[in-house]
């Protein structure tokens, strides 16, 4: 709700989420006994790149932030629902066993339809709307997979138990961080 009520507050929230996620990455690395140093450094660099974009996302016009946030929420929700209903083929079972092709396709279709319904929040052309939406979804999905890969490498289910039953900050915000990074990049390159 800070997106609409106090848009500047969302920027500070983005910084807080980014810092908390970084602490989780470092904490998990230390809990592992400092294993896989090269993998950790590469992961931290990728995370820093996503977070840089995510913090810029927090400075975008509030309607665009709201649009991206709603599209990501719809994608996450409907990927899970359609995956449970029609998901047979696992995408990367060793990295993220719950992700199915049916879930990704279903979530993407519902998100694209929703993007057209939410067009009033988006100021660009139809082509820009489609590119923005598909890019946001692709980045969000990639961020989610990278988080899963990191957890598998360090042999844990969740980054931490901060939120019982939901894991830590990165378990909740990985898609938003990476999808927000694309939204900021796309806005600054094409939509300004």
State what each model feature region is.
Residues 1-139:
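Membrane-embedded alpha-helical bundles of polytopic integral membrane proteins
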Residues 128-129, 173, 192:
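Short, conserved aromatic-histidine micro-motifs
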Residues 185-192:
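Juxtamembrane boundary at the C-terminal end of a transmembrane helix
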Residues 153-176:
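Interfacial loop-to-transmembrane junctions
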Residues 85, 148-156:
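Juxtamembrane interface at the ends
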């Amino acid at each position: 709700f800070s997106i609409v009520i106090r848009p500047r507050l969302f920027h500070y929230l983005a910084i807080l989420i980014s810092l908390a996620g970084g602490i989780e990455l470092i904490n998990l690395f230390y809990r592992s006994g400092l294993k896989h140093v090269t993998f950790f450094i590469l992961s931290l660099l990728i995370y820093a790149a996503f977070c840089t974009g995510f913090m810029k996302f927090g400075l975008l016009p509030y309607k665009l932030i709201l649009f991206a946030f709603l599209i990501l929420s719809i994608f996450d929700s409907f990927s899970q629902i359609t995956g449970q209903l029609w998901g047979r083929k696992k995408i990367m079972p060793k990295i993220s066993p719950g992700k199915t092709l049916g879930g990704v396709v279903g979530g993407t279709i519902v998100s694209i339809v929703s993007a057209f319904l939410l067009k009033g929040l988006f100021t660009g052309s139809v082509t820009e709307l489609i590119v923005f939406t598909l890019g946001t979804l692709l980045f969000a999905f990639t961020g989610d997979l990278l988080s899963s890969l990191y957890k598998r490498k360090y042999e844990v289910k969740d980054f931490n138990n901060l939120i019982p039953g939901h894991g830590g900050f990165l378990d909740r915000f990985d898609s938003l961080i990476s999808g927000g990074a694309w939204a900021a990049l796309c806005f600054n390159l094409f939509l300004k």
